[in-house]
Amino acid sequence: MEDEDRLYRLNGIAHVAGYIEEEPSRVITAVRRQQNMPLHDRIIPYLETASLYHLARLNSQWFWVDESLLSAFIERWRPETHTFHMPFGECTITLQDVAYQLGLPIDGAPVSGCLTEFENLMEHGRPAWVWFRELFGELPPQSKVKQMTVCYTWFHERFRVLPAYATDETVRVYTRAYILMLLSSQLFADKNANRVHLRWLPYLASLDDLGRYSWGSAALAWLYRCLCRGTNRNVVNLAGPLQLLQSWIFWRFPTLRPTGFDRFGFPLASRWAEFVPRNDAGAQRLVSARLALDRLRVHDFVWEPYSSTDVAAVIHPEILADEHRRLWTAVTSLIYFAAIEWHQVDRVLPQFGGVQHLPDGALNIDWLHTKDGRGGDRWFPTYYQEWHQLWKNRLQCSISGSEADCVD
């Protein structure tokens, strides 16, 4: 069959699902990094203010991921709909899942701005390395710097242990390092696994304002983007918040979850903190996982895993606040700097206790999938103004109300 006749397309490159017979054993390699910095009591108040404390608690242990299982799910991911296409229908990871699994806030300002040209593109911006010195008190040696990134090892060596009698300002410096590493490893890891990008400097400059951002929607935007990239048959590495993806699978697909993990707390992803998958026979396990997905029926998927009394008993109430809950069913944009994705929950209404109607056609955002911030820095709230406006109007786009004004 000629490439032009392939059913699975992604920006001109065929979807891996269309090549299973030719390449039956592509197992994605998970690109991940552990933050691995102790959480000091004096840093915790800043994390609570930033709404990142629950994520920091997840950071205390390394989360292993089953690469063969994730690879089988990627084969069923459709970039057009941001859903997994299963034998029983569509399902996906939503903002509700992010809240329960990672304990992140959903409502808030988008995580956006520019990447490096702070002095040129933002009000009160500073040259990147000048700002870095102001925030961290020093510059890393040139051997630890590559363009606008710094080696993880430098932060580990310099800021891993807070001095016993640190001043308040020293605590703030170490807090910036902790949060920078936390965001770069747990939520927004990319394929450059050994380096930290300077895009976070404007956020770290104002620790007291970090709580006003929608970390949950940004994390989901980045996971969607990484999954969409992963469907490209030529891609072999997968980054992003993979502990979210794997925990979502285990919570919603009981036949695929490991045994012996019945106890759980909050955030719900902590349930699998001690899970260690097999690391051998990856191709064979991929085939087994693929067959398991082929045999799934509607009763094999837990549509509402968070409605149980056991879950209600451990949930922290702040994630259930109205301003966050209302967005779980919003059909809206998801923003993480240059990565813009679409929250298409109108296709998975049973995950919210609803009855699935025939959904509208998928929103064509193929051109957005070609944008990743390379090719020149920009002020993304202006460059992607339409999509930022959609997030600004997010409360008007809940499927519990009218969808007519959400998408033209």
Predicted regions and their residues:
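Structural stabilizers in ordered domains
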Residues: 1-408
